[in-house]
Design a protein with these regions (language model features):
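Extracytoplasmic/secreted proteins, especially bacterial periplasmic and envelope-associated proteins
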Residues: 44, 48, 52, 74, ...
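Bacterial N-terminal signal peptides
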Residues: 6-16
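An extracytoplasmic/periplasmic, membrane-proximal ligand-sensing/linker region
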Residues: 29, 176, 241, 263-327
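Positively charged n-region of N-terminal signal peptides that target proteins for export
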Residues: 1-4
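A ligand-binding cleft/hinge motif common to bilobed small-molecule-binding domains
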Residues: 95-105, 169-173, 200-236
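N-terminal (or domain-start) structured segment
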Residues: 22-112, 151-153, 159, 175-204, ...
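Hinge/capping helix and adjacent helix->loop/strand transition within the periplasmic-binding protein
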Residues: 81-88, 101-188, 239, 252-285
Length: 327
């Protein structure tokens, strides 16, 4: 009987210690890995998020660690292999879903090596062109595209960039192959579009809105399924409404943890994320970036997981059909 009582007491003590450990989370700084260089859009989102996320995590410091390279797969791989204790998280964008198709030798499995914490924001995209194009709306642009097959240049910011992915889907949707012109970043691509050296580009509102407002490029449509409310873009039709049924592209960001992270920790981080995304200053900063903070069901881990899986299934065939790989 004494042995039994001792065993029960020991079990009770171990359970109590485990509960206390979870209750104390976090008791040290948390690291959010950004799989891209400092200063970029994803880095900016992570730093803004870290400032408000800490409020729901015992006010612990949130450290941003930039681990760039290989289209975001190096940083993601680091998190996949990290201790599943809630102290190493990943903030990634649409590349989380496109990497499995772009890279034929992946160092991790997106769907089985991570816990999904929730979606953070999404950035719409716009189809834009040089000001000397004869078209002034999408209907006219579509006629011009059909009349100039084999002569059209489509710029992007480089292999696997958002503008590259949107451009691939656009070409397949209009069933017209265009000459893809990859640049080393959005800056030089936009410079040549403004200068008239290339014809078209599909890029984030973060990069195009000011140029549209300044009359330096023409805007023909938005890539999202719903019209935008930004004054400079509110009158633009969606590509879906212009006959490209189902066309819906945005650059989104999500938060992830290593597989096996305790549910109690995941729940706490998700609760902190929900609170952070309601912070007025954070919302304003995202709006200034041209991003829309997520407030729908995709904030839930299970729903974000479904969303990412659907994105993988959407982009896989597009990338494979184009035969453009990153490795």
């Amino acid at each position: 009987m004494k042995r039994l009582l001792s065993l029960v007491a020991a079990l009770g003590l171990s359970v109590g210690l485990a509960s206390n450990a979870l209750a104390a989370y976090p008791d040290k700084p948390i690291t959010i890995v950004v799989p891209f260089a400092a200063g970029g859009p994803t880095d900016k989102v992570a730093r803004d998020l870290g400032e408000v996320l800490r409020k729901g995590l015992n006010n612990q410091s949130v450290i941003i660690e930039n681990v760039g390279g290989a289209g975001g797969t190096l940083g993601a791989a680091k998190v996949a292999k990290a201790a599943p204790d809630g102290y190493t998280l990943l903030l990634h964008h649409i590349g989380m879903a496109t990497a499995p198709a772009l890279y034929r030798k992946m160092p991790y499995n997106v769907m089985s090596d991570f816990e999904f914490l929730g979606m953070v924001n999404e950035v719409p995209m716009t189809l834009v062109g040089r000001t000397t194009l004869p078209a002034n709306n999408f209907a006219e642009l579509r006629k011009w595209i059909d009349a100039n097959k084999g002569k059209i240049n489509l710029a992007n910011a480089g292999l696997a960039a958002a503008s590259h992915l949107c451009g691939l889907l656009f070409q397949q949707s209009v069933a017209v192959d265009m000459t893809t012109v990859p640049y080393k970043g959005t800056g030089p691509a936009m410079t040549d579009l403004i200068g008239g050296q290339v014809d078209l580009m599909c890029d984030q509102t973060t990069n195009t809105t000011a140029q549209i407002e300044g009359g330096k490029i023409k805007a023909f449509a938005v890539s999202t399924s719903k019209p935008l409310t930004t004054p400079a873009l509110a009158k633009l039709p969606t590509l879906d409404s212009q006959g490209l049924k189902g066309f819906n592209v945005s650059i989104w960001h999500g938060l992830y943890a290593p597989k096996g992270t305790p549910k109690a920790v995941l729940d706490q981080v998700n609760a902190a994320l929900r609170t952070a995304l309601k912070d007025p200053e954070f919302v304003k900063r995202q709006q200034d970036l041209g991003a829309v903070v997520v407030t729908d069901e995709r904030l839930a881990p299970a729903e974000h997981r479904k969303f990412v899986e659907a994105e993988i299934n959407k982009w896989g065939p597009v990338i494979k059909a184009a035969g453009q790989y990153a490795d």
